[in-house]
Amino acid sequence: NDRRGDLMLLINGMPVIHIELKKSGVPVSQAYNQIEKYSREGVFTGLFSLVQVFVAMEPEESVYFANPGMDGKFNKDYYFHWADFNNEPINDWKKVASLLLSIPMAHQLIGYYTVADDADGVLKVMRSYQYYAANAISDKIKKTNWKDKNSLGGYIWHTTGSGKTMTSFKSAQLIANSKDADKVIFLMDRIELGTQSLQEYRAFADASDDVQATENTGVLVTKLKSNDPANTLIVTSIQKMSNINSEEDGLNSKDIELISNKRIVFIVDEAHRS
């Protein structure tokens, strides 16, 4: 194979980010078209199948996107411009190199902010605003004073189709992996939404049983009390939560003491409705 890419970033000796460069005045589309051509020709096989993220770059514009794999399809809807905290696109190549492609961000992008979606078998990389949101949530939890019963949370306001489900899952995963909370509860306002979200979260997870369902209020109470690490991420509904104090299998005083001593984070989907 005589194909040769422009730049390859290695982490621990493994090729994980491939960068294709074009000179000023040449559209960035030529760079990503070349990456797609290389993929069709089988360049990213063997050792180079480890490449997770592609970057197409010319001095005034850069886009990044996940490697869909040999059997995957490139979709330009998922070619992203990196942006700052205010969602202003960053196009200058020097800023992209320093803010996205340098240590520690390049490590974090590959290690924390890509998701292998089991639903379609395609690797997904998060947009910049998803990164900022998930990072802000996990940082907030890290700094939480759990003894302060009046401690406030926060909200993320993203539009329809912006990837809120992935953002909420990644936030919960970061919190769970950091051990900054004992439980992370995905709270849905409709049972049907809970079923759908459970399927999506399990598709994002490393293993399907990393995200726990709650068939009824009794199961919810049991998993809230549990010290098993497998019961850290839980999907439930407002209905089941509200039934805790009214159903026969709800809480007793001992349960209340056990649960109140745990650090519990609630992530509420469609919070404006509930």
Predicted features and spans:
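Conserved helicase motor
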Residues: 191, 213-223, 238-243
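Conserved helicase ATPase motor motifs in RecA-like P-loop NTPase domains
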Residues: 159-160, 272-274
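A generic local structural motif
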Residues: 40-42, 172-173, 218-222, 250-255
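Conserved motor-coupling elements within RecA-like helicase/translocase cores
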Residues: 217-234, 258
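Acidic/polar loop patches that form or flank catalytic/metal-binding clefts of enzymes
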Residues: 208-215, 274
